[in-house]
Regions:
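Accessory beta-strand-rich segments of carbohydrate-active enzymes
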Residues: 1-19, 27, 35-36, 50-54, ...
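An acidic-aromatic loop/edge-strand motif
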Residues: 85, 90, 95-111, 160-162, ...
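Beta-strand/loop-rich accessory regions of lumenal/periplasmic or secreted enzymes
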Residues: 85, 94, 142, 187, ...
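Intrinsically disordered, low-complexity Pro/Gly/Ser/Thr-rich segments with frequent PxxP/GP/PP motifs
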Residues: 268-284, 648-678, 687
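Extended substrate-binding grooves/exosites of carbohydrate-active enzymes
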Residues: 1-37, 96, 193, 309-621, ...
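Short glycine/proline/serine/threonine-rich loop/turn segments at secondary-structure transition edges
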Residues: 131-134, 174-178, 282-295, 676-682
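Catalytic cores of secreted or luminal carbohydrate-active enzymes
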Residues: 195-219, 570-619, 629-649, 662, ...
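Accessory carbohydrate-binding/adhesion or oligomerization-edge regions at the termini
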Residues: 1-100, 184, 261, 541, ...
Length: 1015
């Protein structure tokens, strides 16, 4: 048999001599190996391989796979790795469009020929001594997009699924001494039409490669089921085993032992046969869930007639029952709510080559932020993910390697008819797709974490996908099947067991469920977290507890798919689509993570953690109603600490014993009386881990709630020297003890504020109506719709018209009865129709300056992004201390997770690391903020409850940069004090607008007052 490269465009050519898919358990040669976790039956081939890069199939070196071909002149390459990350070609980011679109006219199933890189690998090895006289196989855990394999010049086989193992038997071709393993990996093959996922397009051997040997009596496959009775009390562990038995081995036995922390729970033994079926009754097992991921240990031991161990196979077992009950999804008898996230298998330094420690970091971050579910968008992940999800407690939607968005998008746009869909009704593609279903199922079937199988993503509908769903059901009666595409194509509506949609607003979900009550509803993608986003997420999360049929969703998505690199000056930066010269591309649309590319949490995570927490409370002065949204865990499992603060300063704390059963609520008296001393009080309930867990240490906060009340304070009366007003020809000065304020007639505004002899202002404060557009703004054309407000922010002036110039030529300083002095300016906003704003400064003898901005609505002028003031201070004033909502940035539609308190930050730290610079760093409900230098000198800003930000850049500088390295050098600190900024939105990033309730109402007069004073 020979490899026929011409078949790469044949959808029926997806496996040749490939080993049948099987479970991902690990086998050990004896119990001693098992005890130390090192198996002699496996030998890694990771490391350096010889490598040749061809731009297309025609440039592949003929005969490179021959045993006598000399590859010493080839380069070395690391395995596992994407070749594009090793300097061969470049990553290409594309969302919907196929990566070859526009370069070559390629029909469905065909592949590009002019540019379709081929990676040729050679690895020499000696068969490890412990594998001698055994059957030997090679496993490629991930080869993108397909792989052909040779050993010592003999063609071994072919496989064409990038994301499930490609395994081949090598036994017949092994020789004594050095063996030569050669393989050829095409960047694109027929299967690539099914791999149009929204990710960085790369290729190569990107997961582990290893040899494994099997003993003469071998557990080739294992399928376990945990069958709970209808009371969810007792269980049967149902085991189906397939064995590979060499005729020479003689009589063998297999023992089954289920243990719990070393204690034997159940056992059985039987004669080894090709197929075995064993059931182990288990009384009252501890059940597995995200809240309590309890795992038992199953050990299968194969022994020969003399009792000698031939093989030992361990398997973790989580007892759980997932089912459709009363029209809803239930786990262990309880209605489940998915608090999930979509996760691409991605590492900023190596692409889809994800080290286990990076994977663990991701999952620990999820657990710490109350995420309970993962959707493996949109392909099977490495086996390590499922083992860790079993251990840590994360529910999984395991998704088949299928996305053909680039084909059905043309149907949606009306360019093609329905028959163009892939796989659609093209039954010639069915064998490949059913094979992908089977490969994923067989590998992953024993993981307790997997509750739902998914047929794939964004591939429209049709007969083929329906058959995929049917195959899942035939293979597994313990899980449900998911497919979102039925929303677009209802021909096979029962392809999915649940209604699944993407980015439908809550009002749309309500409407759908009002008319369709036959099955539950989930959002497999929602809250598109591109850039500064996740606004109004709570609308979705709260709805899950209002509508039983709505059972949660999965945020899009977990991590920015950005690649760590250097700018031209050697500074670290994170690159996105188009930065590699890749075209076509979709630029920064890969930056949708609630964590940055390096795994650091973005400010959005603050809201995600809060919206997903299982304990909520409503606090009123001296009592709290605590609601427990957990399925199985009493609130008594956590320490609850009540914290009392006055004006942001903690004055008392005390434990509060709670005992709220799952899905119930109870009222508790707080350990503090209502305070009588004047001030603003916060009562915070903090729920914390009582003991260390695998994902966080004792004392870690898993949930909090906060109540606020105020007690009237008596006004303070302090005496200061009277103000001295100097009315010059071109300036008006207002002077007091230790400070001086100057208003300029020529420049039309506050030109100077000196405190203690130091000038505090870098420029004249200005009315501001603009923010740097966030990604959601750009997707909804906000810059175009609101452009007049950008112009107003840049060019509003007191001399915008001759009439205004006359009115503002000699502003009058009015001396008020309380000893203060006021001066007023009228700004023309340069809008069409004309708009005006009135800015009034009032200087008090203490040195405080009140700033009031007034705006009267103008018919024909639309919503404004922001209403407030902008001023600059020297960059030395970069230390921020404030009393408001924090600690991370927050907005009117993303304040969940922020708490009222006193926080510290810096202007530079306030710049969030979104891939494209945009609005960031805002804080809501700010009572006061101090902007100082390192010696504590600066300005204190105050208001009742303003929005506030302090950044090193203006909104326009942020807007003008497409990368962080395009931002200018830091010269000042930009203060923006606002009545309000519009919300950031987040329903999607390509058209959805900020919800009306989170916009600034410009149909009514707007007035905003804040003050500043030197410190």
């Amino acid at each position: 048999m020979k490899f026929d490269a011409s078949r790469l465009k044949d959808p029926s050519f997806f496996a040749e001599n490939r080993v049948h898919a099987h479970a991902d358990h690990i086998a050990y040669a004896n119990l001693e190996e098992l005890s130390i976790g090192e198996t002699s039956l496996c030998h890694s081939l990771n490391g350096l391989w010889k490598f040749h890069h061809a731009l297309n199939a025609a440039q592949v070196i003929p005969g490179f796979e021959a045993a006598d071909y000399d590859s010493r002149g080839w380069a070395d390459i690391r395995v596992p790795a994407h070749i594009q990350m090793e300097g061969y070609g470049a990553p290409q980011y594309a969302n919907v469009q196929y990566p070859w679109d526009g370069y070559q006219d390629v029909a469905i199933g065909e592949i590009p020929t002019a540019y379709n890189p081929v990676a040729c690998y050679i690895k020499t090895f000696f068969v490890p001594e412990q594998m001698a006289d055994r059957r030997v196989f090679v496993s490629f855990q991930g080869a993108e997009s397909c792989i052909a394999v040779w050993l010592n010049g003999h063609y071994v086989g072919f496989a064409g699924d990038s994301f499930t193992p490609s395994e081949f038997e090598l036994t017949d071709y092994l020789i004594e001494g050095e063996n030569k393993l050669a393989c050829r990996v095409e960047r694109w093959s027929a299967g690539s039409w099914l791999e149009d996922q929204d990710f960085m397009r790369m290729s190569g051997l990107f997961r582990d490669v290893y040899l494994y040997a099997i003993p003469k009596a071998h557990i080739a496959d294992l399928h376990l089921k945990t069958l709970l009775d209808d009371s969810y009390t007792d269980a049967v562990l149902d085991l189906s085993v397939q064995m590979a038995l060499d005729p020479s081995v003689g009589a063998c036995s297999v023992s089954f032992e289920l243990t719990d922390g070393g204690r034997l729970v159940a056992s059985a033994a039987c004669k080894a046969e090709a197929s075995l079926h064993v059931q182990l009754p288990v009384k009252a097992p501890k059940l597995w869930s995200s809240e309590s991921p309890y795992l038992y240990d199953l050990l299968l031991t194969v022994r020969d007639a003399d009792g000698r161990v031939l093989e030992a196979v361990p398997q973790r077992v989580g007892f759980r029952r997932f089912e459709m009950k009363d029209g809803m999804m239930h786990l262990n008898g309880k209605r489940i709510v998915f608090k999930g996230v979509n996760r691409h298998d991605f590492c900023t330094d190596s692409g889809r080559v994800v080290p286990v420690e990076t994977l663990r970091r991701d999952l620990l971050t999820m657990k710490r932020n109350n995420i309970n579910a993962v959707r493996t968008c949109h392909y099977p992940n490495s086996s390590a993910l499922y083992a860790l999800c079993d251990e840590l407690g994360l529910y999984v939607i395991d998704e088949t390697n299928m996305e053909t968005h680039g084909t059905w998008e043309t149907i949606e746009r009306g360019k093609r008819d329905i028959d163009y869909a892939l796989p659609g009704n093209r039954m010639e593609w069915a064998p490949m797709m059913l094979d992908r279903v089977n490969s994923m199922f067989q590998r992953d079937k024993n993981h307790a974490c997997i509750l739902i199988w998914s047929c794939g993503n964004e591939s429209f509908g049709g007969d083929v996908i329906y058959e995929m769903s049917r195959l899942f059901h035939r293979l597994d009666d313990t899980r449900l099947v998911h497919y979102e595409g039925i929303f677009h194509d209802r021909r096979h509506n029962d392809t999915s067991d649940m209604e699944s949609q993407m980015y439908t607003p809550v009002v749309g979900i309500r409407k759908y469920l009002a008319e369709h009550r036959e099955r539950p509803f989930i959002m497999c993608e929602y809250t598109h977290a591109m850039g500064n986003s996740c606004g109004a997420m709570s609308d979705y999360t709260e709805y899950a507890y209002e509508e039983p049929l709505y059972q949660g969703g999965f945020v899009w998505d977990y991590i920015d798919q950005s690649i760590r690199t250097k700018d031209r000056y050697g500074n670290e930066t994170f690159a996105y689509g188009g930065d590699f010269g890749d075209r076509p591309c979709d630029y920064n649309f890969c930056g949708n993570g609630i964590v940055y590319g390096d795994g650091e949490e973005s400010p959005k995570m603050q809201a995600v953690k809060y919206n997903y927490q299982n304990i909520i409370a409503e606090i009123a002065d001296t009592k709290a109603v605590i609601a427990n949204r957990a399925m199985f865990t009493n609130t008594g499992a956590f320490d609850c600490v009540a914290i009392l603060a006055r004006n942001g300063e903690i004055i008392a704390s005390a434990p509060l014993e709670t005992d709220v059963p799952p899905m119930e609520s109870r009222e508790y008296a707080l350990p503090f009386a209502r305070q009588t001393r004047g001030g603003e009080y916060t009562v915070t309930l903090s729920f914390r881990l009582k003991a260390d867990t695998p994902w966080a240490q004792r004392g870690y906060e898993v949930a909090f709630a906060q109540g606020v009340y105020a007690v009237q304070e008596a006004p303070k009366h302090e005496r200061y020297a009277p103000l001295r007003v100097v009315r010059g020809d071109f300036n008006t000065g207002v002077h007091g003890e230790h400070f001086s304020v100057l208003f300029g007639d020529l420049k039309g505004g506050l030109t100077s504020y000196r405190w203690g002899g130091r000038e505090m202002l870098k420029s004249i404060p200005r009315p501001n109506f603009w923010r740097a557009p966030v990604d959601n703004d750009c997707g909804s054309n906000m810059p175009q719709r609101y452009a007049q407000w950008k112009i107003a922010s840049m060019y509003a002036a007191t001399n915008a018209t001759p009439e205004l110039a006359r009115l503002n030529a000699h502003p009058v300083a009015t001396e008020n009865a309380d000893g203060s002095v006021s001066i007023r300016y009228i700004y023309g906003l340069c809008t069409q129709p004309d708009g005006h704003a009135v800015l009034t400064y009032t200087v008090h003898p203490c040195g405080q300056v009140d700033v009031t901005l007034d705006y009267n609505p103008v018919e024909g002028l639309g919503d404004m992004p922001e209403f407030g003031m902008l001023l600059k201070m020297d960059a030395d004033y970069d230390q921020i201390r404030y009393y408001g909502y924090g600690p991370n940035e927050n907005y009117v539609d993303r304040r969940e997770g922020a708490r009222l308190g006193i926080f510290k930050t810096t202007a530079k730290e306030n710049v969030s690391r979104y891939l494209v610079p945009q609005e960031c760093g805002n804080r809501t409900g700010v009572r006061w903020a101090e902007v100082t230098d390192h010696r504590g000198r600066g300005l204190r800003f105050a208001s009742g409850a303003m929005e506030f930000s302090a950044l090193p850049y203006t909104p326009h500088e942020l807007e003008n940069a497409m990368h962080d390295y395009e931002l200018p050098p830091i010269h000042y600190t930009v203060i923006r004090a606002n009545l309000q900024q519009m919300g950031v939105g987040g329903d999607d990033s390509w058209g959805a607008r900020t919800h009306d309730e989170h916009l600034i109402d410009v149909k009514k007069p707007l007035s905003f007052t804040f003050s500043f004073k030197g410190i």
